[in-house]
Amino acid sequence: MKLNEISDNNGARKGRMRVGRGIGSGKGKTAGRGQKGAKARSGVSINGFEGGQMPLHMRLPKRGFNNIFAKDYAEVNLGMVQRVIDAGKLDISGTVDHAALKAAGLARGGKDGVRLLAKGELTSKVAFKVAGASKGAFAAVEKAGGSIALPEAQPSEQEKKAARREANKAK
């Protein structure tokens, strides 16, 4: 007996039914779709339509909203940073920023930068330059002898406009 001679027992795998292949097949002519109507025609049926019954997505209440001002940060835990430092994948001689964390494989996504979180333990002295950090992360980094530099907040367009108005009033 060879591997290429082995086959399944008869009836172990049921073949796929090919529809619309003549009346002798048992699924010819209408191919199991019945007579006429929208369900007999080609094309997909209406998604979510439950035959006139109130659909599930309308029975459930609306909830939440999408905040267009939400910041998208890549969250990085200090324990993971320490693990990467110990593995020699992160150079801590200079400032560790978003690009360095991304190169080390820690920061995925985060179009608005990196936010440090205090989960895990940091023992190395590291200077971070990131978009945000939790209070616990600040404390842990400073305890290890490092520092965290955050970007200075840029005034919004409304604040700039208000400042211009005040300057014009003073003239």
From Swiss-Prot:
Disulfide bonds: none annotated. Transmembrane segments: none annotated. Pfam families: Ribosomal_L27A. The keyword Iron does not apply. Residues 157-171 have a biased composition (Basic and acidic residues). SUPFAM superfamilies: Ribosomal proteins L15p and L18e. GO terms for biological process: translation. It comes from the Bacteria. Residues 21-35 have a biased composition (Gly residues). One of its GO terms (molecular function) is rRNA binding. GO terms for cellular component: cytosolic large ribosomal subunit. Part of the 50S ribosomal subunit. Belongs to the universal ribosomal protein uL15 family. This is Large ribosomal subunit protein uL15. It comes from Novosphingobium aromaticivorans (strain ATCC 700278 / DSM 12444 / CCUG 56034 / CIP 105152 / NBRC 16084 / F199).
